[in-house]
Amino acid sequence: MEEAFQSDYKKRGCRWAGAVSLPPLPKDALVLETGCGNGKTLSAFSCRAVGVDISSEAVRLAGAKNAVAGDVRALPFSDSVFDAVFCWHVLGHLMEADRIKAVSELFRVTKPSGSVYFKAFSASDFRFGKGTEVEQNTFLRGDGMLTHYFSVDEVLSLFGDGEVFENNWSMRIRGVEHPRSEVIGIFPKNRF
């Protein structure tokens, strides 16, 4: 996985563009963005933010002093540090056992009063089924990118109690409409 991202960032530079819509957070909040990539979302936070990405090339492109190379399965941070942890379109690039490890790490670095914010593609997305299926609902594309497509129930099973919903929209590509779909969730650490 790391090699695929390193290669792609070196070849294309910026992978994702577009406006970022963030939930309101207190100005004094400390936020972690996992999979910070080129820093697009990291730079949009109006509070203190730290980014981590498996690709050192992405971290270099982000040009941010507050971004480090690291793995979401073994985050290089102490316990209970962040008020909010964002994991947007990261877990879908992992196999099931690694997704479970990563979720444990996300909660480990979140303060007891904090929350984990999740977003990933759902099985309703038009790209579902493209590539070679390597696990249920997980596909390996020709460029080496692994993508898992989630269901709401799967996300609840992975994270536990929280607010989860599916967001559907349409994207026009070369004059043809394609269905896009994400599962989005917010999971307070202190759920009990």
Labelled PLM ranges:
Residues 100-112:
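A short glycine-rich, Lys/Arg-flanked "PGG" loop and its adjoining helix->strand segment in the class I
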Residues 1-74, 98, 115-192:
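Class I (Rossmann-like) S-adenosyl-L-methionine-dependent methyltransferase catalytic domain
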Residues 92-94:
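A short His-aromatic
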Residues 87-90:
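A short beta-strand submotif of the Rossmann-like class I SAM-dependent methyltransferase core
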Residues 73-85:
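A short acidic, Gly/Pro-enriched loop at the edge of an enzyme's catalytic core
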